[in-house]
Curated annotation (Swiss-Prot):
Belongs to the PlsX family. It is found in: Cytoplasm. Catalyzes the reversible formation of acyl-phosphate (acyl-PO(4)) from acyl-[acyl-carrier-protein] (acyl-ACP). This enzyme utilizes acyl-ACP as fatty acyl donor, but not acyl-CoA. NCBIfam families: plsX. It catalyses: a fatty acyl-[ACP] + phosphate = an acyl phosphate + holo-[ACP]. The lineage of its organism: Bacteria, Pseudomonadati, Pseudomonadota, Alphaproteobacteria, Rhodospirillales. This is Phosphate acyltransferase. Gene3D superfamilies: Isopropylmalate Dehydrogenase. One of its GO terms (biological process) is phospholipid biosynthetic process. InterPro entries: FA_synthesis, Phospholipid_synth_PlsX-like.
Length: 351
C-alpha cells in the first residue's frame, strides 16, 4: 500500500474553476486513493461540488478564502496584494510542511512568482525551469524550460540539463538519459553564445551526464534524446507550436472525413487507428508542467484543461513527491561540490 501523500490545490485557479478542479480531484482519487487534498478557495462554491462526489469528501479539507488570482493579474501585483488568495495559501501550505506539493491551473506568471517567493530555490540552483513531457515516435521526451526564463545564460542551461537528467532518472526510470541542447543546427559553430558555451561545458565537464549534443526542432518529437534543454522563450514557442499543430491535424482529419459520403464510409474502417493516434497526441495526457529547482513541489496545470487533464497534473505532483525528486536534486548538487566546480562555474568558465 502506498504511503499517504497530501497535495494542496488552488481550487479557484483555471478557466472552469472550481468545478473542473473538484471533478479533476475526483478522477485523480480513482487512480490515487492514498492521496489527501487541502483545497483552498471559496467554501460556498466548493462544498456543493464535494456533495456531488461523496467518495472524495473524506480525503478533502477545505480552507476557505474568498480571494483568488485572476488570469490577467500581474505577478508583481499578486506578490504585493495576493497573500490571502487561494493560490498563495496553497503554495504556503507546502512551505509550512502541511502539503508535499501544490497544483494550480491559475495564472502561470503569478504561480511562478509566488512559488519562488514563498518556497525559494534549492541550494545551488539559480533559476527554476518549467518542464513538461512531449509525445514522440519513441515514447516521450522531457523538455525544459517551457517559459519561466525568457533570457538564459550558459549557466542556466547547464543547471536545466542537470535538473532534467535527475528527473529522467528518478521519475521516468531511465538508467542513462541522453541530453540534447535545442539549437538552429547540429553543427558546433551554430547557435548563440549561451548555447555554444553550455554545450562546451557539458561536453568537457565531470558531470555524470550523457550529453548527445545539439538537437533541432524536428528532433523533439522524433525522440532523438530523452531530455531537450532550451531557454524559456524558445521552449514556450515550441510548446505552443506543437499544440497548434495537433489542433490543425485534427481539423484536417475531420474536414477530410466529412468531405464526401465515400470519405465518411472510409472513416468507419479507419476509426480505430485514428482514435489511437488521438489518444497518443491528446494534450490532456501530458498536462502538468513542473516547476523544477524550487525548494518544494509545484505543478502548473493548463488553465483551459478539463477534469481529465487536471487529474493528470495531480498525478505529476504525486510522482515528484513519491520519487523524492527534490531530495535527489539536492544530493546531485551536493555531490558536485567536492569537485570544486559547480555547474555555474563550469558554464561561466566557457563564456
Amino acid at each position: 500500500m502506498s504511503a499517504a501523500v497530501t497535495i494542496s490545490i488552488d481550487a479557484m485557479g483555471g478557466d472552469a474553476a472550481p468545478d473542473m478542479v473538484v471533478e479533476g480531484v475526483r478522477m485523480a482519487h480513482e487512480r490515487l486513493p492514498h492521496v489527501r487534498y487541502l483545497m483552498f478557495g471559496d467554501a460556498s462554491r466548493i462544498e456543493p461540488l464535494l456533495a456531488r462526489f461523496p467518495e472524495i469528501r473524506g480525503v478533502c479539507t477545505i480552507h476557505h478564502t474568498e480571494e483568488s488570482v485572476s488570469m490577467e493579474a500581474k505577478p508583481s501585483q499578486v506578490l504585493r496584494q495576493g497573500r490571502k488568495s487561494s493560490m498563495w495559501l496553497a503554495v504556503e501550505a507546502v512551505q509550512k510542511g502541511e502539503a508535499a506539493g501544490i497544483v494550480s491551473a491559475g495564472n502561470t506568471g503569478a504561480l511562478m512568482a509566488v512559488s519562488k517567493f514563498v518556497l525559494r530555490m534549492l541550494p545551488g540552483i539559480d533559476r527554476p525551469a518549467i518542464a513538461g513531457m512531449f509525445p514522440t515516435v519513441k515514447g516521450e521526451t522531457l523538455m525544459l524550460d517551457l517559459g519561466a526564463n525568457v533570457d538564459c545564460n550558459s549557466n542556466n542551461l547547464v543547471e536545466f540539463a542537470v535538473m532534467g537528467e535527475v528527473y529522467a532518472r528518478a521519475v521516468l526510470g531511465l538508467e542513462k538519459p541522453s541530453i540534447g541542447l535545442l539549437n538552429v543546427g547540429s553543427e558546433d559553430m551554430k547557435g548563440n553564445d549561451a548555447v555554444k558555451a553550455a554545450a562546451a561545458a557539458l561536453r568537457d565537464s565531470h558531470l555524470p551526464i550523457s550529453f548527445y549534443g545539439f538537437v533541432e526542432g524536428n528532433d523533439i518529437c522524433g525522440g532523438t534524446v530523452d531530455v531537450v534543454v532550451t531557454d524559456g522563450f524558445t521552449g514556450n514557442i515550441a510548446l505552443k507550436t506543437a499544440e497548434g499543430t495537433v489542433k490543425l491535424y485534427s481539423t484536417f482529419l475531420k474536414e477530410g472525413f466529412q468531405s464526401s459520403l465515400l470519405a465518411k464510409f472510409g472513416y468507419l474502417f479507419a476509426r480505430h487507428a485514428i482514435n489511437k493516434v488521438k489518444v497518443r497526441t491528446d494534450p490532456r495526457r501530458y498536462n502538468g508542467a513542473m516547476f523544477l529547482g524550487l525548494n518544494g513541489i509545484a505543478v502548473k496545470s493548463h488553465g483551459g484543461t478539463d477534469a481529465f487533464g487536471f487529474a493528470n497534473a495531480v498525478g505529476v505532483a504525486v510522482e515528484l513527491v513519491t520519487h523524492g525528486y527534490n531530495d535527489r536534486i539536492r544530493k546531485e548538487f551536493d555531490r558536485l561540490k567536492p569537485a570544486e566546480v559547480s555547474p555555474s562555474q563550469l558554464a561561466a568558465g566557457t563564456r
